[in-house]
């Protein structure tokens, strides 16, 4: 299920665009996640009280968390699938502390692709979208495998 060198290059090329504004992209990803899948908001004590998009946009905590999420994801993507060391602590915290189901990782993956498409459509054609989808699926599958090792049925 791995990606070819050419696919990784497509992923990293568009990720460079994301990195030009990690806070803005991260905020947009979380807002899209919470609006599209309101049940995910319940996993975030710091954000549960945010009911409207305007409230979400005004939240510095939400923007900071979006930055954290996309910074971590960028570090994982740059490993081109060799991300064991990065995945382990992430799976540990998301399984044992946050109890984030794999389904929610699918939801945020969708949000990431939608945000990149809306902000960088000229640099995110079908090939790049397909490569990013594969990279995010690889990430999710590896997280799911770690969840299983940890006994989390997420």
Swiss-Prot record:
GO terms for biological process: removal of superoxide radicals. One of its GO terms (molecular function) is nitrite reductase activity. O2 binds at residue 65. Its EC number is 1.7.-.-, 1.11.1.-. Nitrite binds at residue 65. InterPro entries: Globin, Globin-like_sf, Myoglobin. Keywords: Cytoplasm, Heme, Iron, Metal-binding, Muscle protein, Oxidoreductase, Oxygen transport, Phosphoprotein, Transport. The keyword Cell wall biogenesis/degradation does not apply. Heme b binds at residue 94. The modification Phosphoserine is found at residue 4. Monomeric heme protein which primary function is to store oxygen and facilitate its diffusion within muscle tissues. Reversibly binds oxygen through a pentacoordinated heme iron and enables its timely and efficient release as needed during periods of heightened demand. Depending on the oxidative conditions of tissues and cells, and in addition to its ability to bind oxygen, it also has a nitrite reductase activity whereby it regulates the production of bioactive nitric oxide. This is Myoglobin. It comes from Orycteropus afer. The lineage of its organism: Eukaryota, Metazoa, Chordata, Craniata, Vertebrata. The gene is MB.
């Amino acid at each position: 299920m791995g990606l070819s060198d050419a696919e990784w290059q497509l992923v990293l090329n568009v990720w460079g665009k994301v990195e030009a504004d990690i806070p803005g992209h991260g905020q947009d990803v979380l807002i899209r996640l919470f609006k599209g899948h309101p049940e995910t908001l319940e996993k975030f004590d710091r954000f549960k009280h945010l009911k409207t998009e305007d409230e979400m946009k005004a939240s510095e905590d939400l923007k900071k968390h979006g930055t954290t999420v996309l910074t971590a994801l960028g570090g994982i993507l740059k490993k081109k699938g060799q991300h064991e060391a990065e995945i382990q602590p992430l799976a540990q915290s998301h399984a044992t502390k946050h109890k984030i189901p794999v389904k929610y990782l699918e939801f945020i993956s969708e949000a990431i692709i939608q945000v990149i498409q809306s902000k960088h459509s000229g640099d995110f054609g079908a090939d790049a979208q397909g490569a990013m989808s594969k990279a995010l699926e690889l990430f999710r599958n590896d997280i799911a495998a770690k969840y299983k090792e940890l006994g989390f049925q997420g």
